[in-house]
Design a protein with these regions (language model features):
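Helical scaffold of the NTase/Pol beta-like nucleotidyltransferase catalytic core
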Residues: 1-41
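Alpha-helix boundary/N-cap detector
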Residues: 10, 14-17, 21, 74, ...
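Charge-rich, solvent-exposed alpha-helical interaction surfaces
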Residues: 18, 22-25, 82, 86, ...
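Short glycine-rich, low-complexity/disordered patches
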Residues: 26-42, 92-108, 185-201, 208-210
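Conserved catalytic core of two-metal-ion nucleotidyltransferases
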Residues: 29-33, 80-132
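Active-site nucleotide-donor binding segment shared across nucleotidyl transfer reactions
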Residues: 30-61, 65-73
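A broadly used, surface-exposed interaction patch
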Residues: 63-89
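Right-hand nucleic-acid polymerase module
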Residues: 105-106, 115-210
Length: 210
């Protein structure tokens, strides 16, 4: 059992500002290849960032990096490599380790070398936004070592409408408690905060809406 609690806006803001500065520098580095937009997603966009008081792992942020390559000049592995190399040029200057390449995201971590704790981390998903809230992301297939564009699961669709409904019906506080409980009970280290939050929103919406 974990012991997750919410991070205050005051604590999260300087880290968020630093990550945005890193993203701006990455945009400058890759502009000869393609451009991209960014936006915080998941708990990062809803003031629901958490950290586990029982672990040595700090809080985490999530950003979507929307790649503009409509003519498909670059393959998924080329895009991922260009982005990873650019992030690796910038992030270490701010005290972060080099990127970790996981199935859905590129992750950077700021580690306190004196006590071997992770102060905070950030997951970058490389995405393409289609119509009707449908989104693709670059997936790293670890078994065969290749990269492909894949559609996000249906659980991420129409989340904004469900969030609006929950807020209008004064269920946001209940959702926050539900999300923390799910995080505390999660034993899958590969399940990221963004997925747990999407599950929480969908489950709460279905339960209350009927």
């Amino acid at each position: 059992m974990h012991d997750f609690v919410y991070v205050t806006r005051k604590s999260a803001k300087p880290v968020r500002d630093e990550l945005i500065q890193i993203i701006h520098e990455v945009q400058n580095l890759v502009e000869d290849y393609f451009t991209f937009q960014f936006r915080p997603v998941g708990s990062s966009s809803m003031n629901m960032i958490t950290f586990d008081q029982k672990s040595n792992i700090g809080f985490d942020f999530d950003f979507d990096l929307g790649i503009n390559d409509e003519e498909e000049n670059y393959s998924p592995d080329e895009i991922r490599n260009i982005m990873r190399n650019a992030i690796d040029q910038v992030a270490p200057r701010y005290g972060y380790k080099h990127c970790e390449d996981s199935t859905r995201v590129l992750t950077i971590k700021k580690v306190n070398i004196f006590n071997s704790t992770i102060e905070h981390s950030c997951d970058f998903a490389l995405v393409y936004n289609c119509e009707d809230e449908i989104q693709q992301y670059i997936r790293f297939n670890k078994k065969n070592g290749n990269y492909t564009w894949e559609y996000q699961s249906k659980g991420f669709k129409n989340l904004n409408n469900k969030i609006v409904w929950l807020k209008q019906n004064r269920l946001w506080g209940e959702l926050q408690d539900y999300y923390i409980d799910k995080k505390n009970r999660n034993n899958n280290p590969d399940k990221h905060s963004r997925s747990i939050l999407a599950e929480s929103i969908n489950e709460m919406y279905q339960k209350k809406r009927g």
